Each structure stands twice: as C-alpha cells, then as structure tokens.
Design a protein with these regions (language model features):
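General structural feature for long, well-ordered alpha-helical segments within catalytic domains
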Residues: 27, 31-35, 65, 69, ...
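Catalytic alpha/beta core domains of metabolic enzymes, predominantly
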Residues: 144-301
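A short, hydrophobic/aromatic-rich structural module that often spans a beta strand
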Residues: 95, 112, 196-211, 335-341
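Alpha-helical structural signal in soluble globular domains
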Residues: 68, 72-80, 108, 112, ...
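Active-site beta->alpha loop and helix N-cap motifs at the rims of alpha/beta catalytic domains
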Residues: 2-167, 325-330, 347-378
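Structured C-terminal cap/extension of enzyme domains
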Residues: 41, 229-378
C-alpha cells in the first residue's frame, strides 16, 4: 500500500459543490465546470472542493452521475492548481446506498487520482458496522489495488440510513482514526456534537494528523468570536470547555457555492479573531441564509440546494437551476422573490465588504457570453 506519511489534511475552506443538472437529471458538464471555476475564484475561494456530497445531491443520483461530477471537479481543480500555482484539493464523495457501489466509487476516485475520498459510513445501507466496513472493505480494496488515498469520514444525521444511529459513536471514530488512511471527519451537527469530536480526538494518540471540519459553517462565528465584554467572555469560556480548546481544522460551507470569496475571508478573519471583521462577514453570509428562508403553512421552508443553484443562475454562472427529483424546490413566486433578494444581497456586500473579497464571475465562453464580464458587484 502507498505510504501516506507525507500527507497532511488541508486546512481552510471546503465547499461541497452543487451538481448542475438538466431538467432530466443529467449532469451538464460545461456548466458544472463553470461552477467549479466560480467557487475557486482564481485562488480566493475554496481551498478544497467536495464533489458528490449531500449538497451535491449524491443520494438522489445514480453512480454514473456521481462519478461524472467527480471527474469534472478533479479535472478542474487540477487545471486551477496549475494556473494559480497553489494546490486546490479535490475530494470525491464516494458514499452510495450499497457497499458495492461505494467501493466502486472509491476505485474510481483512485483512478482519477483525487486528493481524498469522503465516505458517510452510516449512509451505506448494507454496512452493518462502520469501522468494519472502513477497515476491512475499504482497506481491502486499497490492498488489492496497491494504491491508497486519504479517507475522510462524514457524519451527518440527515443522511443516516434508516435504522442507523444518527451519529458515529466516538469509540468507532477512534478505531477508524487509527487506520493510516483515515485522516479526518466532517461533522455536520451543532456545537455539542462537534465538541464531542474535538474532546475525543485530543485523546486518540495517533501517529498521524486527524482533522475535524465543521460542517455547520455558521458555528465558526461563535467559536472564534473574541472574548469581548462579559457575555463574550462567558461564551469564550464555554466554547473552550465544549471543544477542549481544540478548534475546527477547517469549515465545510455549502453557502460558499454562492459566496466563495466572502466565506474564504470569513474563515480567515475568524481564525485571526478580528471581532470587527467577524461581525462584518458574518452579516454578509447571513444575508444569503435569510434569502434562502421562506414560509409555507406558517412554518420556515429553507430549500438551500435549490437556492444555491438559483443564485448561480442569477449571477450568470450557469443557465440551469434544476434540482434532482425529491430535492426541495422553489415555487414560481418564491423563485422571483429569491432573485430580488440575491440582487439586494450582492449590492450590500459590494458596499460593505473589503475590496477584493466580493465574489465575481468571469463569464465562461461555453455559456455564450463574452469573457471578461464581471458579476457580483451589483
């Protein structure tokens, strides 16, 4: 098996990219490539792109679709890395509903020479034991192929298979983390669950780095907020207790599909503890969350995937905002209202944020627009 001794998990902003689909559910390659380039922002956007994740509707596509979007993302990240002189990592989501399809996706990720693979063991319906599957079957495939790539675990209660625990057990994570190729976990959960991971990881005593990425991106504005005033000091002490003074290695931000520069800057100012800029960028990204929130039958309705795709269409990055079957969608009136909200959001961000940190789009010729048209400044 290939040694992973030189691999260190990439810190920073990871974006689980949306999958650009036709109304028939087919991956639109030219538009998918445009979306990847937009998210990278010439090096000012995502540090990592995560293909075929939950935001990418992996659970509503077949394996052909998952592998197609993975191929596109890996290729575009490789091209971008060469162009900007800095590596943009491409992580391939390999999770499928069955063990056989999941392993087929892992084999394909290896063939693509992807930087890493991401698996949600609790989402694989016929995998009775997450650590057994990751150790015996994933490890067995590596041994058979004679090649190894880093594996990152994915813990998200929303996609756990029926009858499975909503979250991975700490003892199972500890066992999997001891495997040479398991290098971290993406935790889509609140602060308490994230804290369980950070506290546990401090006692793993591993021979390699094990990174924890916050899958609820808005948590960083709380976790990294400076201890200013009585309330801030109390929050700071509580956060240190909950996380055992161990902060996330990176952030996985679905809304960075729409605001890649803003989220990159948000991560940086949070890490730096700059209270003024934390508040400013927190407000900027909160505008998108508010724009994605509607009411149906008196209850909040938040179709984030449909909104991210609609926003990319409004910014003229893509032409199709179709979602997969069963993905929550926008009604016509909601779609019109959302377009107006996006326009207001873009104008506010252009007025309030630092120069160079408002996302812009250099239109792709495949979309029949002249190159050099910048979008995102209103």
């Amino acid at each position: 098996m290939q040694s992973l001794s030189e691999y260190f998990p990439r810190p920073g902003l990871s974006t689980p990219i949306v999958t650009i689909l036709s109304p028939k559910g087919e991956v639109l390659e030219h538009e998918q490539r445009a979306a990847v380039r937009y998210i990278i922002q010439g090096g000012r956007g995502a540090d990592i792109l995560f293909a075929a994740g939950t935001t990418g509707e992996w659970d509503r596509m077949d394996n052909r679709g998952r592998q197609t979007v993975s191929r596109i993302v890996v290729d575009e990240c490789r091209r971008a890395s060469l162009a900007i002189g800095r590596r943009i990592e491409a992580w391939v989501g390999i999770t499928a509903h069955t063990r056989a399809e999941t392993l087929a996706n892992l084999k394909y990720a290896i063939e693509l020479d992807s930087d890493a693979a991401v698996v949600a063991p609790l989402s694989v319906r016929d995998a009775s034991s997450p650590p057994d599957f990751v150790e015996r079957e994933v490890g067995g495939l590596f041994e058979k192929l004679g090649r190894t790539i880093p594996i990152f675990l994915y813990d998200n209660a929303d996609i756990a298979a029926p009858g499975k625990s909503p979250h991975l057990h700490t003892r199972d994570v500890k066992r999997m983390a001891r495997l040479e190729y398991v290098r971290g976990v993406k935790v889509t959960a609140g602060k308490a669950v994230l804290g369980n991971y950070t506290r546990a990881a401090s006692h793993f005593k591993l021979s390699h780095e094990f990174a924890i990425y916050a899958g609820d991106p808005y948590l960083i504005f709380d976790l990294f907020a400076p201890a200013e005033g009585i309330a801030g000091s109390l929050r700071h002490r509580w956060n240190r207790y909950v996380t055992q003074r161990s902060m996330p290695y990176g952030v996985v931000a679905g809304p960075a599909n729409v605001l890649p520069r803003e989220w990159q800057r948000a991560w940086r100012v949070c890490r730096a503890g700059n209270g003024q800029l934390i508040a400013r960028y927190g407000g900027a990204v909160e505008r998108l969350r508010a724009a994605c929130t509607f009411k149906r039958a008196g209850k909040p309705y938040v179709p984030v995937i449909a909104c991210y795709k609609a926003a990319l269409k409004e910014l003229r990055v893509v032409e199709s905002d179709a979602v997969a079957r069963a993905t929550p969608s926008l009604e016509s009136a909601e779609r019109r209202e959302f377009a107006a909200r996006v326009e207001r959001m873009v104008k506010c961000n252009a007025q309030e944020l630092e120069p160079g940190w408002v996302s812009e789009y250099d239109a792709h010729p495949a979309l029949d627009r002249a190159p050099g048209v910048l979008r995102g400044h209103g």
